[in-house]
């Protein structure tokens, strides 16, 4: 009996530090990237061994366009580009991204070392197009002051929420992840009274208690991001969001990263937020927080990365024959000269 595939460490508890790296693969860099991906678990072990209590964990995601450039064979059933959304007032853009590295640890030096080594290994084959350094903000709060990730599943429920099952047997044990970088208008947000902020989020700010359905505004964040199946059971995702910021430029926000067994769950959440449910009833948080990136990735198992399928054979164009330019003769003299040589 075959053992189940070992997943990547996406169920690692939230940490104090994180780095999010998004790469695009350079033309002709596919084989080099393919080779680096097979070394990721070894790099994680080697760097993490230097600080055993540091909790270094790295998750690799592969984008829709990159998959066919890197691997022969089957393709994940639900892997597709990010679905761009344009509502009456707010927009969720689709942005480039072939590789995601979600790097976490209890201390930033481990994250930084791993990010540096991977980036150096990929030099000349892939280019960093987005880099975000996240940090824990007090008791898992975002920069808006609210606890983030309260409704995350745990234990077996978390495993079920993020793990592809028998519906796609070639990739059982894998996951999907959607990332977006949000920039906050902190001046505008901080101008709101706490009571109004709580109406935007749908939770109390200090106690982190969700409002009851009779009190919660229909356009609050919590009202629009609960997804239920046909029987009324909530379908969950795992959020590993992290705050980030630059004080000098006042650029600060939240890096949203949502793992799930199917991207359709997160996509429905985003549709509710940007388009509205019903249409026009968009998430009020978007009046203060702007999405500037949006990418879908597939997270294969650790076993897949350790021993990936071969890279596709690059087709070499067949040599073409170019007829000589005719001078109007039959070339008989040339044939005679050839015969005489």
UniProtKB/Swiss-Prot annotation:
Annotated catalytic residues: 148 (proton acceptor)
EC code(s) of this entry: 1.11.1.-
Any one Gene Ontology molecular-function term assigned to this protein's record: metal ion binding
Keywords: Encapsulin nanocompartment, Heme, Iron, Metal-binding, Oxidoreductase, Peroxidase
Record bears the keyword Heme: yes
Chain residues that bind heme: 221
SUPFAM superfamilies: Dimeric alpha+beta barrel (SSF54909)
Biotechnology usage: The 38 C-terminal residues can be used to target foreign proteins to the nanocompartment.
Pfam families: Dyp_perox_C, Dyp_perox_N
Signal peptide feature range: none
Subcellular location: Encapsulin nanocompartment
Residues in coiled coil: none
Main location (coarse class): other
Region (Targeting peptide): 304-341
Cellular component terms (Gene Ontology): cytosol; encapsulin nanocompartment
Swiss-Prot/TrEMBL cofactor(s): heme b
Keyword flag Iron: yes
Family: Belongs to the DyP-type peroxidase family.
Functional description taken from the UniProt entry: Cargo protein of a type 1 encapsulin nanocompartment. Has both general peroxidase activity and dye-decolorizing activity. Can catalyze the oxidation of both protoporphyrinogen IX and coproporphyrinogen III to their corresponding porphyrins. Also efficiently decolorizes the dyes alizarin red and Cibacron blue F3GA. This cargo-loaded encapsulin nanocompartment is probably involved in protection against oxidative damage.
Protein name: Dye-decolorizing peroxidase
């Amino acid at each position: 009996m075959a053992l189940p595939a070992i997943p990547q460490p996406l169920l690692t508890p939230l940490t104090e530090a994180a780095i999010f790296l998004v790469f695009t693969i350079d033309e002709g860099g596919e084989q080099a990237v393919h080779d680096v991906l097979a070394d990721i678990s070894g790099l994680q072990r080697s760097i993490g061994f230097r600080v055993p209590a540091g909790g270094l964990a790295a998750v690799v995601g592969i984008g829709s366009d990159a998959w066919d450039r890197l691997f022969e064979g089957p393709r994940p059933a639900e892997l597709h580009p990010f679905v761009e959304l344009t509502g009456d007032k707010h927009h969720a853009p689709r942005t480039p991204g072939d590789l995601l590295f979600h790097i976490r640890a209890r201390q930033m030096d481990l994250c930084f070392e791993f990010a540096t080594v991977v980036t150096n290994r990929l030099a000349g084959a892939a280019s960093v197009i987005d880099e975000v350094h996240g940090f824990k903000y007090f008791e898992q709060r975002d920069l808006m002051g609210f606890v983030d990730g309260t409704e995350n599943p745990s234990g077996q429920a978390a495993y079920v929420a993020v793990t592809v099952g028998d519906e796609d047997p070639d990739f059982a044990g894998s996951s999907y992840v959607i990332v977006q970088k949000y920039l906050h208008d902190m001046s505008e947000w901080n101008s709101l009274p706490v009571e109004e902020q709580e109406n935007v989020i749908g939770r109390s700010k200090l106690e982190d208690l969700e409002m009851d359905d009779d009190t919660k505004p229909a356009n609050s964040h919590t009202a629009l991001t609960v997804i239920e199946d046909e029987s009324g059971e909530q379908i969950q995702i795992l959020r590993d969001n992290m705050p980030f910021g630059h004080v000098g430029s006042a650029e600060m926000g939240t890096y949203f990263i949502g793992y799930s067994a199917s991207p359709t769950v997160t996509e429905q959440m985003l549709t509710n937020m940007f388009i509205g449910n019903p249409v026009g009833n968009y998430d009020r948080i978007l009046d203060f927080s702007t999405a500037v990136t949006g990418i879908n990735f597939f997270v294969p198992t650790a076993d897949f990365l350790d021993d990936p399928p071969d890279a596709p054979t690059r087709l070499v164009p067949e040599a073409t024959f170019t007829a000589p330019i005719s001078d109007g003769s039959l070339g008989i003299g040339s044939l005679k000269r050839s015969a005489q040589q």
